[in-house]
Amino acid sequence: MKKTLLSVLLPAAFISNTVLAAEIYQAEDGSTVDLYSRLGFNITNKNNAHGDGKGEFDGRIGLSGSQTINEHASVIGMAQYQVGAAEYANQVNDKPALTARYVWAGIDAKEYGRITGGRVSSGLIMFTDIGDVFASSDVSMARQANKVDKTATQVFRQDGTLQYQNQFGNLDVSAAYILGNNTSELDYGYNAALRYTIDMGDFGRLAPVVAMQKNKGDTREGNDTDYTFWGVGTRYYLGDVMLGALYSEDELQGFYTQTSTDKVTELTAVYNLSDKWALRAGYRSLQNSGGDELELSDTTLEVQYKLTARSSIYTSYVDRNGERGYNSGQETSFGGAHADESYYHFGLRYEL
């Protein structure tokens, strides 16, 4: 079998889960290996007691691949790592560590769907992406998921997940069973998401999404927690404008003395001003009751300038008017900043 390998392999950079990739291997039967990478440097005064700016580095690196079985199916897989990722391994390591964001293998059966297992890219990202448009701030929904599953990064990714995804016309579907692992202390979990894209011709496109997840802790490991998440939202596309709106709730039982409930609303707007410039704005509200009592009320304004098709400069300001949360006398935070302290962000992002 004739094979082609790029003569110069790209040096180690750090990976993104975007569709951007460099193909470094291709076989005659269609099998491929792709390199993903991202490097970034950010200046921000987020969570700085003196209000001074500080520099932060982030980077990702990884490989994804596909091996052709026949014309109907392929073996697929991905391993993606990040410096300073929001993973459990970094919560127990004081130093920035290279930790796994995604590590999975599966079968792509074309029109019959795709099955993946491991630390997968959750189908619930169809929902969370509605609010996840900024380089400088994170979505806040499902923030309590890691109280029942230590490996969970909200509902984006969790160890030991077996997932099925497919597309039927304009309908995208995803369903998963979460087995967990020895670190998870999880009895079971499952989730599902549906997205339907409505083409309205000259009036644009509407893409409503519904999502849910359920997790149960393993009482044999002393984890007597129960977690439920659901959300509804939509994106609307018209020319160079994209608008998004979502609402979600999650309930955590067995961690606090009462049932802890987060209610989250997020609104986003993106305008591609030109091939080089993009403008973004958004509002985020989170209200917790029965738990840490955290409240978020964030307004974000962001400007992106595209240096190349894949690399950009971002600058933003996040106005925060929430209230800090507390658990056992210790402040809880989300997004790396106090809920009542605004901050700026300036960053350069290189992507391959």
Model-derived segments and spans:
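Transmembrane beta-strands of outer-membrane beta-barrel pores
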Residues: 41-45, 81-85, 121-123, 170, ...
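Outer-membrane beta-barrel "beta-signal"
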Residues: 305-307, 336-352
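Detector for outer-membrane/organellar transmembrane beta-barrel domains
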Residues: 187-301
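Repeated loop/turn-to-beta-strand initiation elements of outer-membrane beta-barrel proteins
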Residues: 69-75, 111-115, 170-173, 201-208, ...
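Hydrophobic, lipid-facing positions within transmembrane beta-strands of outer-membrane proteins
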Residues: 57-61, 101-105, 158-162, 190-192, ...
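Outer membrane beta-barrel
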Residues: 23-45, 49-182, 186-188, 196-198
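Cleavable N-terminal export/targeting peptides
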Residues: 1-28
